C-alpha cells in the first residue's frame, strides 16, 4: 500500500474477559493477544490500527463518531450488541466507513436469539465461528479492500 491506511478494531461488551469467559464458545486466547496479533499484521502491511473495547454502547458509538473522516475501515465485534443495537448500526451508517462484522463463535450454532444481526446486511462481510483467526481474516480482507480503492 502506498499510503498508510487507518483501521479501527472495535470490540463490544464482555470481550475484555476473553481467555477466562466461556472458553468453550470463545476460546482461551485473550483480547490483548488478539490485538497484539493485529498490530503485528498492521506493521507488516504499513497500516495503522487503533484497538478499542468498551462494555458501554455509548462509548462504542462515541468512538465510531470520532472515527468519521479519520478511519478508512472498521473491524467490529459488537458482541451481544449484534442482536440488540440499532443505535450502533445507525452510528456505523452515519459515518459511512466500510466494516466487517466479526464473531469468535458460530452464532448460528447457538441460541436462536443470537441468529439475528443488526449489522450483517450493511457490512462488507461477516466472519463468524473461526475463533481468533477470524480477526486476522477480517484484517486481511480490509487490507485487500483498501488496496482496491
From Swiss-Prot:
Keyword tags: Amino-acid biosynthesis, Aromatic amino acid biosynthesis, Lyase
E.C. no: 4.2.1.10
Pfam families: DHquinase_II (PF01220)
A single GO BP: aromatic amino acid family biosynthetic process
Pathway: Metabolic intermediate biosynthesis; chorismate biosynthesis; chorismate from D-erythrose 4-phosphate and phosphoenolpyruvate: step 3/7
Site residues (Transition state stabilizer), renumbered to this chain: 21
Residues binding substrate: 77, 83, 90, 104-105, 114
UniProt-listed HAMAP family: AroQ
Assembly behavior: Homododecamer.
UniProt-recorded name of the protein: 3-dehydroquinate dehydratase
Organism: Haemophilus influenzae (strain 86-028NP)
Amino acid at each position: 500500500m502506498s499510503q498508510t491506511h487507518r483501521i479501527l478494531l472495535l470490540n463490544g461488551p464482555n470481550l475484555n474477559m476473553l481467555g477466562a469467559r466461556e472458553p468453550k464458545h470463545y476460546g482461551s486466547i485473550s483480547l490483548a493477544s488478539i490485538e497484539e496479533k493485529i498490530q503485528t499484521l498492521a506493521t507488516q502491511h504499513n497500516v495503522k490500527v487503533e484497538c478499542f473495547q468498551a462494555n458501554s454502547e455509548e462509548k462504542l458509538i462515541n468512538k465510531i463518531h470520532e472515527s468519521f473522516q479519520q478511519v478508512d475501515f472498521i473491524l467490529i465485534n459488537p458482541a451481544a450488541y449484534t442482536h440488540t443495537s440499532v443505535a450502533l448500526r445507525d452510528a456505523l451508517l452515519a459515518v459511512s466507513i466500510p466494516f466487517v462484522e466479526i464473531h469468535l463463535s458460530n452464532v448460528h450454532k447457538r441460541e436462536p436469539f443470537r441468529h439475528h444481526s443488526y449489522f450483517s446486511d450493511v457490512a462488507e462481510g461477516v466472519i463468524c465461528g473461526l475463533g481468533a483467526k477470524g480477526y486476522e481474516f477480517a484484517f486481511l480482507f480490509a487490507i485487500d479492500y483498501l488496496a482496491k480503492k
